[in-house]
């Protein structure tokens, strides 16, 4: 069976209404995506702590409608636009989509990810590419990160170059646990991952177990106390600014702090939030994102 995929780029205020109209008029499925995803202009889905939540959709939204083979995309788009009084008609593209074994197709699209010198993130259906590699087995599709985003890669590259054996390490905002797990595999000592999302904590525990890593993952109120030799936080700029005092307090004198999830244009203001306690500099930049690092004075 063949389907048709119709992709429309629309303004934020029209995305939800157009999606509902397309679905009401016979689309098999409709999704809304950030047209600027994976660029420096991407927007957090639900906003950042301390900022107004994102509205119903992104500034530039992409509406993707899956249609039956015999559907007429032009008529459907025109009818949907008319239903919500949208003028002029949005630009759209259409492509044919063959029915396939989607599990196999998805797996074929994800190859092992090489990060730094010897780190590989490997889906469960692949073997490790190098016998001496530092391998993390993580499957794509996790909501909490698999190493493909520039900020995650930057943090992993930093860890590969700078982790010292036995260092007590904290991954704050651990998501999938990927940074805590790689730190442990690189020789870190006691390793703790913290996240405000219980699902992320559970995902991290699962990933640590499948990677044969001993680490503690917990919600903030349940996390081990004390200071750490190494604190890494790959979150977003505004929560990083809001949590500056707390994160600095978690770093022991002489310990190191690594931050990412920060756009190049945000680096100066994020560093300013930490300047009174830990001076931060840009370690490396990639694709509009930066990794900041610094040492807490003794």
UniProtKB/Swiss-Prot annotation:
InterPro entries: Ribosomal_L11_MeTrfase_PrmA (IPR050078), Ribosomal_PrmA_MeTrfase (IPR004498), SAM-dependent_MTases_sf (IPR029063). Keywords: Cytoplasm, Methyltransferase, S-adenosyl-L-methionine, Transferase. SUPFAM superfamilies: S-adenosyl-L-methionine-dependent methyltransferases (SSF53335). It is an enzyme of class 2 (transferase). Its EC number is 2.1.1.-. Methylates ribosomal protein L11. Belongs to the methyltransferase superfamily. PrmA family. This is Ribosomal protein L11 methyltransferase. It comes from Ralstonia pickettii (strain 12J). The gene is prmA.
